[in-house]
């Protein structure tokens, strides 16, 4: 029982660990001089020449942790939802979509920064744009994931309803943010910050509720045995 409780808490902590690694990547990658979709191909080449690719494994590990957290959410919600559990499955599908879209951009980033100033400007811009648009589309996956969390949690439980409702709101914000960016080419990601904050709160909440649920189960077993 103690080992199972420890493993459950460890799985729930994947969301918190994901945010830690994601923030590490964002802090290292936050550079006012970095090119965006409005930059010229030549400026992308010049920037790539002076900035070798960072620790891609950190971002890859962060994506794996996000997928694990999506599986944890699926498990909690699926246990409360009646068969066939379609809404809970949508949570898992959204997480898988978000992770897959982001990981798909890794080869483009590695080619761009490993070749440095040798890349043709048009090719360099295309590689950079692939990375940016991939991230924008990954927000759609995150939106599906949290939108499904909101629906399943409010209707069937499995997680606190306040957590489910706030997740649903953030899911809508993610979709609006992604749609606006994809339509205009802008690169503001306010909703992504809300997503990271929600994941932190959800991860800590699920870790705490694991202990509370186990204690309730023990008390119930003691009460049954005393009869």
Segments predicted by a language model, with ranges:
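Hydrophobic, aromatic-enriched alpha-helical segments typical of multi-pass transmembrane helices
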Residues: 1-227
């Amino acid at each position: 029982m103690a080992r199972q409780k420890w493993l459950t808490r460890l799985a729930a902590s994947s969301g918190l660990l994901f945010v830690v690694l994601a923030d590490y990547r964002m802090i290292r990658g936050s550079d006012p001089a970095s090119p965006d979709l409005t930059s010229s191909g030549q400026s992308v080449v010049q920037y790539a020449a002076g900035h070798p690719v960072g620790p891609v494994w950190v971002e890859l590990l962060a994506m794996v942790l996000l997928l694990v957290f999506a599986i944890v959410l699926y498990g909690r919600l699926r246990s409360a939802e009646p068969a066939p559990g379609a809404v809970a499955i949508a949570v898992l599908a959204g997480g898988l979509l978000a992770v897959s879209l982001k990981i798909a951009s890794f080869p483009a980033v590695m080619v761009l920064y490993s070749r440095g100033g040798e890349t043709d400007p048009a090719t360099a811009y295309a590689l950079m744009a692939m990375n940016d648009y991939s991230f924008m589309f990954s927000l759609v996956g995150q939106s599906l994931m949290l939108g499904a969390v909101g629906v399943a949690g409010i209707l069937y439980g499995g997680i606190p309803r306040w957590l489910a409702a706030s997740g649903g709101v953030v899911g809508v914000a993610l979709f609006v943010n992604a749609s606006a960016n994809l339509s205009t080419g802008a690169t503001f990601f306010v909703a992504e910050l809300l997503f990271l904050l929600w994941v932190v709160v959800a991860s800590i909440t699920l870790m705490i509720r694991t202990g509370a649920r186990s204690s309730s189960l023990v008390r119930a077993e003691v009460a049954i045995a005393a009869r």
